[in-house]
């Protein structure tokens, strides 16, 4: 797979240098190797994981550019935070994962990739005491559930940034969440994905 061609088309703002490209590829390798014994992804090859998951996370680079002190809820195999932490090595990321085996992988990845800007918490999100500027999540839960977590972890200026798919599903989840329009600002941004319909939902 031509990783360079994928990454070169990701962002107009962020330059992904060779060291960061190598770390992204190494991360994919770590995931697939760990997945042989512990199920952390449905991807079968490094190429599939890179194309379907890492590249997808990086589609929102421009959106995360202005945010810091980020917590990833239900991080799983490290998505979206590990790819983001590789690119934004000056930003702090907290990876929240309640399952021990997955949290063990996140610590392994942190060590192998030399990511001093991430912290792994093996804890239920509702038990977290700290506040965060940015709360994000990908393929973890619906908007209603994540909004409850957001309300517990947010400050007055915090934002909830969610990776989501089809607009119809997003609208359905927003309706089910019964969000008070006068209480929250909701922004939906379409991501430039060639293969599937992808959006970012920003709630503040």
From Swiss-Prot:
<dbReference type="Pfam" id="PF02527">
    <property type="entry name" value="GidB"/>
</dbReference>
<dbReference type="GO" id="GO:0005829">
    <property type="term" value="C:cytosol"/>
</dbReference>
<keyword id="KW-0808">Transferase</keyword>
<keyword id="KW-0963">Cytoplasm</keyword>
<keyword id="KW-0489">Methyltransferase</keyword>
<keyword id="KW-0949">S-adenosyl-L-methionine</keyword>
<protein>
    <recommendedName>
        <fullName>Ribosomal RNA small subunit methyltransferase G</fullName>
        <ecNumber>2.1.1.-</ecNumber>
    </recommendedName>
</protein>
<feature type="binding site">
    <location>
        <position position="79"/>
    </location>
    <ligand>
        <name>S-adenosyl-L-methionine</name>
    </ligand>
</feature>
<dbReference type="InterPro" id="IPR029063">
    <property type="entry name" value="SAM-dependent_MTases_sf"/>
</dbReference>
<feature type="binding site">
    <location>
        <begin position="125"/>
        <end position="126"/>
    </location>
    <ligand>
        <name>S-adenosyl-L-methionine</name>
    </ligand>
</feature>
<dbReference type="InterPro" id="IPR003682">
    <property type="entry name" value="rRNA_ssu_MeTfrase_G"/>
</dbReference>
<comment type="similarity">
    <text>Belongs to the methyltransferase superfamily. RNA methyltransferase RsmG family.</text>
</comment>
<feature type="binding site">
    <location>
        <position position="74"/>
    </location>
    <ligand>
        <name>S-adenosyl-L-methionine</name>
    </ligand>
</feature>
<keyword id="KW-0698">rRNA processing</keyword>
<comment type="function">
    <text>Specifically methylates the N7 position of a guanine in 16S rRNA.</text>
</comment>
<dbReference type="GO" id="GO:0070043">
    <property type="term" value="F:rRNA (guanine-N7-)-methyltransferase activity"/>
</dbReference>
<feature type="binding site">
    <location>
        <position position="138"/>
    </location>
    <ligand>
        <name>S-adenosyl-L-methionine</name>
    </ligand>
</feature>
